[in-house]
Amino acid sequence: DLFIGDTLALVNATARMTLSEIPEAVREVDLELLRPYAVRHESGVHFYTWFFAPERNLPEYIDLGRLEAVLRALREGYRFVLVDTPLTLYVPDLELLTLMDEVIIVAVPWDLLSLRATKALALGMSRWKVTPKLLFNRVQADADLTPEFIANQLGLEVWDIIPNDGRTVVQSVNLGDPVVISRPESEVAKAIRRAARRLAGLPTEEPKRRKFLFFG
C-alpha cells in the first residue's frame, strides 16, 4: 500500500511500522529487514504499507530508488506482490508504474466525469510507455455507459468486470471483513476470485469442490 493504509482498513488491521520508517542510512534492503514491517492476515496475505493513517503520518514523496529496492526484496520472498497506488494524475508520479510487471486501472463506468479521469490517467501512463489492463468495478447491467463503450473510448480492452453490489461491499468494508471470506458465494466475491485467478495466470473457472458421501 503506497498511500495511507486503506488496504489494511479493509481487513480491520493496523500497521505497527511502515516502510517510510526504514532509516535512510540503510542501503541494503532485503527480506529479513522487511519482515517486521509485515502485517499478517489470517488468510495468509502479508500487508506492507508505506505510510500510516493521515493523523499519524502524512504521505510524502516516495523515493523510486528505495521503492525499487523494496519491490526487489519482496519478489524474492513472495510469489505475487500486489501494489496499491494512490489515485494520481500527475505524470511524474506515474513513473513508479514502470517498476511493475503489470498495471491495472480500476474504473467505475458510471458517468462521463469518470471516463474523463480514467482517460487522463491512461494518457499519463502512456507517457511512460505503460499499457494498463482495464478492470471495471461496480458495473450495473442497466448503465448508460457500458464497459465496452468506455474501453473503446480509451483504446483499451476490457480485462475483467466486477458487478455492483453496494450493500454487500459497503458492509464488508465497514466491518473490515473481506467479501471473498464473509460472502464467498456472492457474485462480487466470485468476480474478484476470477480476476485474481486471471492475474495469477490460472484458469478463470474455479475448480469444482469434491463431494463426499458418507454411509452409515
Indicate residue ranges for each PLM-predicted region.
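Active-site/binding-pocket entry motifs
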Residues: 44, 53-54, 167-168
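Acidic-aromatic/histidine active-site loop/patch
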Residues: 27, 123-127, 131-132, 136, ...
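Conserved catalytic-core segment of NTP-binding enzymes
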Residues: 66-69, 73-76, 80-160, 164, ...
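Short, hinge-like loop/turn segments at secondary-structure boundaries
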Residues: 12-17, 123-125, 150-153, 176-180
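Phosphate-binding loop that captures ATP/GTP phosphates
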Residues: 1-47
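C-terminal boundary of histidine-terminating zinc-finger modules
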Residues: 19, 172-192
